[in-house]
Amino acid sequence: MNIFQHDIQDVGQGNVVAILGSQWGDEGKGKIIDILSKHSDITCRFNGGSNAGHTISVNDKKYALHLLPCGILYENNICVLGNGMVVHVKSLIDEINSIGGNIIDRLYLSDKSHILFDIHQTIDSMQENKKLKEGKQIGTTKRGIGPCYSTKVSRVGIRLGSLKNFEHFKSLYVKLIDNLMELYNISDYNKEEELEAFYQYHLLLKDRIIDVISFMNNQLNEKKKILIEGANAAMLDIDFGTYPYVTSSCTTVGGIFSGLGINHKKLNLTVGVVKSYLTRVGCGPFMTELTNEIGDYLREKGYEYGTTTKRPRRCGWLDIPMLLYVKCINSIDIINLTKLDVLSGLKEISLCVGYRSKATGELLQKGCYPVDEDAPEHYEPVYEQFEGWEEDISNCESFEELPENARKYVLAIEKYVGSPIVWIGIGANRNNTIMKK
């Protein structure tokens, strides 16, 4: 079954589909978003900023997207950045210019999203470097995401809508930057140069900044096909993730409604993207981590290095209790399983199917997950073992063509999670995706 022949409606009822990461990010969301955005009218982002990243290949050309939705690469697609985002405008403009063409005419920015300034990035670096010296680093991308959300919730941040009236924006800007320079003892900061740049951004973007809530609801009323692109992933959610080793936004399904302003009843289908093994960038608990040659094998074969930071990712076995916890939050309808090909060549594959208390020996209740930073001190993973396979599976065209042991592994994941696996990624290229009937 060729996935390119199928519309998003072939995998669920309704026109509004969300693609959400179900682990610690880097699950490979970009590929399925890219595939489905060809068939959608509108592609949206609702959270985060340039700390996220997708690398998409179209017509043998690679595009690194950090702020723009994947749909921007298709002429029939309108793209929306929602109010839940923090936007580093220079990075956005650079991304627009790197793609070329008149793509800005297909882009709308929420007037309620917040502007991320260079000073936010300066503060982020200062804070992370201080934590590093104390041995308490979070492992942020130093893109200024946390400090920008901090000014937002402190009610001193500047919304993108302010940029439509430059004189008003200028007064807000000077007040904010002066306050932050004093608060963080920053003496070397070129406000005049940044203001000059923002005047050009004002001229370029003033007609692209709109009331996204009204726009989105009009599109919903017109029954447009809407693809919602989640940045980061569930276990990095500010509330539900492995706090404090998380991002600063709501990365789970609730962020869609608060970050785009659409009615929760309008979402028809939630796709949970799940990597066939587990990875994590930066610090924080990782109870199935492999610090041996198998972990190195997964990292090198899967090229597990950050799209945004190029940092090596920590690798480990797939964690079923994590997926059940995320399913409780996101109500995952179907699963896109990615990078199954990376497991080829392993003699044995472990699948974490539970956690046992080190103190009592009792198994953790289904749907619960130990997210506290000291969780590894109190729980140990329970594994089920699977025989591996040697074959290269990247040329398989159907689920039935996969090696028997690969099929057994996939079916076990499906059984434990209780949501159907619809797509399986078996290689790096866009067409290395099979549909499981």
Swiss-Prot record:
Annotated positions binding Mg(2+): D26, G53
Its EC number(s): 6.3.4.4
Active site: D26, H54
Residues that coordinate or bind IMP: D26, E27, G28, K29, N51, A52, G53, H54, T141, R155, N232, T247, R311
EC primary class: ligase
Cofactor binding annotation: Binds 1 Mg(2+) ion per subunit.
A single GO BP: IMP metabolic process
GO CC terms in record: cytoplasm
Gene3D superfamilies: Adenylosuccinate Synthetase, subunit A, domain 1, Adenylosuccinate Synthetase, subunit A, domain 2, Adenylosuccinate Synthetase, subunit A, domain 3
Single annotated GO MF: magnesium ion binding
Residues annotated as binding GTP: 25-31, 53-55, 62, 307, 313, 339-341, 425-427
Pathway(s) the chain acts in: Purine metabolism; AMP biosynthesis via de novo pathway; AMP from IMP: step 1/2
Catalyzed reaction equations: IMP + L-aspartate + GTP = N(6)-(1,2-dicarboxyethyl)-AMP + GDP + phosphate + 2 H(+)
Places the protein is found: Cytoplasm
Quaternary structure and interacting proteins, as annotated: Homodimer.
NCBIfam families: PRK01117.1 (NF002223), purA (TIGR00184)
HAMAP family per UniProt: Adenylosucc_synth
Known role: Plays an important role in the salvage pathway for purine nucleotide biosynthesis. Catalyzes the first committed step in the biosynthesis of AMP from IMP.
Family: Belongs to the adenylosuccinate synthetase family.
Note: Parasitic protozoa lack the de novo purine biosynthesis pathway and rely exclusively on the salvage pathway for their purine nucleotide requirements.
Name of the protein in question: Adenylosuccinate synthetase
Organism: Plasmodium vivax (strain Salvador I)
Lineage, broadest ranks: Eukaryota, Sar, Alveolata, Apicomplexa, Aconoidasida
